[in-house]
């Protein structure tokens, strides 16, 4: 895993986004951001029915994929999402921990393909396919 300043700055920027902090997002392994994230299913993440809001899982699956992709980006590159498809497989109740891992399937010159899995109590609760465009940083 790269240990350079750009990598560290990108991870710090992701962790510092107020929305991510509000949701309680944390790295699964602070020494390896590509290992994914986790968050508690608490009041800010619930829908009116008292279950995990789908928008939260969509957003954080995208974040996990970006964290997995960072190590594949050059210092002059950034990645933006242009396609995100999520299948919600089962509802998630309050007071659960959701772990999300992202995996880079293929990094091309201009496009990166990833997948993410959200897991609660050992069961996959959501699966995503994420496509990001690789663009010049700036």
Where are the predicted features?
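Terminal targeting signals and extreme-terminal segments of soluble enzymes
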Residues: 1-138
């Amino acid at each position: 895993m790269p240990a350079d300043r750009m990598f560290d700055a990108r991870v710090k920027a992701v962790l510092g986004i107020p929305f991510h902090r509000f949701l309680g997002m944390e790295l699964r392994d602070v020494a390896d951001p590509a290992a994914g994230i986790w968050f508690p299913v608490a009041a800010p993440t619930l829908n009116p029915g008292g279950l995990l809001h789908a928008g939260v899982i969509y957003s954080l699956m995208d974040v996990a994929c970006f964290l997995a992709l960072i190590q594949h980006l050059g210092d002059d590159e950034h990645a933006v999402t242009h396609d995100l498809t999520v299948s919600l497989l089962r509802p998630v109740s309050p007071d659960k921990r959701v772990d999300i891992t992202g995996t880079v399937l293929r990094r091309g010159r201009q496009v990166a393909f990833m997948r993410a899995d959200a897991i609660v109590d050992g069961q996959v609760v959501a699966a995503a396919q994420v496509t990001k465009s690789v663009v010049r940083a700036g």
